[in-house]
């Protein structure tokens, strides 16, 4: 199930694990990404904590943790090649996997239709 935040993160939910990245809209606003800093595996975050950083030719931006949980994996490929985020932000450009503290919290996030309305 795909969910979104008002801060332009996407989550692909699989049970109690969410794969997290930034949306195509966010990438279009940032421009070409040149640097990514990811969180440590095993680190716990609360909703809206700064979890990662992206830098583009235009600006630096925080990527927020969309829900309470623990980082179980990070995408090292985007650290080596940040352009993967530009070319496939909602696929190969994922940032981290988050084991959710409470799966039901995801119900409060935006669905795709609501997110598209937000960015329209």
Swiss-Prot record:
InterPro entries hit by this protein: 2-oxoA_DH_lipoyl-BS (IPR003016), Biotin_lipoyl (IPR000089), GCV_H (IPR002930), GCV_H/Fam206 (IPR033753), GCV_H_sub (IPR017453), Single_hybrid_motif (IPR011053)
Cofactor note: Binds 1 lipoyl cofactor covalently.
Cofactor: (R)-lipoate
Gene Ontology CC terms, in alphabetical order: cytoplasm; glycine cleavage complex
Name of the protein this chain belongs to: Glycine cleavage system H protein
Gene3D superfamilies, per database record: 2.40.50.100
Any GO BP: glycine decarboxylation via glycine cleavage system
UniProt modified residues of type N6-lipoyllysine: 58
Region forming the signal peptide: none
Domain Lipoyl-binding: 17-99
Subunit organization: The glycine cleavage system is composed of four proteins: P, T, L and H.
Entry similarity comment: Belongs to the GcvH family.
Superkingdom: Bacteria
CDD domains: GCS_H
Protein task: The glycine cleavage system catalyzes the degradation of glycine. The H protein shuttles the methylamine group of glycine from the P protein to the T protein.
Pfam families per UniProt: GCV_H (PF01597)
Keyword Methyltransferase annotated: no
Keywords assigned: Lipoyl
Record's keyword annotation contains Cell membrane: no
């Amino acid at each position: 199930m795909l969910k979104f935040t008002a801060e332009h993160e996407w989550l692909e939910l699989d049970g109690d694990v969410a794969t997290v990245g930034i949306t195509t809209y966010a990438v279009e606003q940032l421009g070409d990404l040149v640097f990514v800093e990811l969180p440590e595996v095993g680190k716990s975050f609360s909703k809206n904590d700064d979890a990662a950083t992206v830098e583009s030719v235009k600006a630096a931006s925080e990527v927020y943790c969309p829900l309470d949980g623990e980082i179980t994996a990070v995408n090292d490929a985007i650290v080596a090649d940040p352009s993967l985020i530009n070319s496939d932000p909602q696929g190969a450009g994922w940032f981290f996997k988050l084991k959710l503290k409470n799966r039901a919290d995801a119900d409060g996030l935006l669905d795709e239709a609501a997110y598209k309305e937000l960015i329209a």
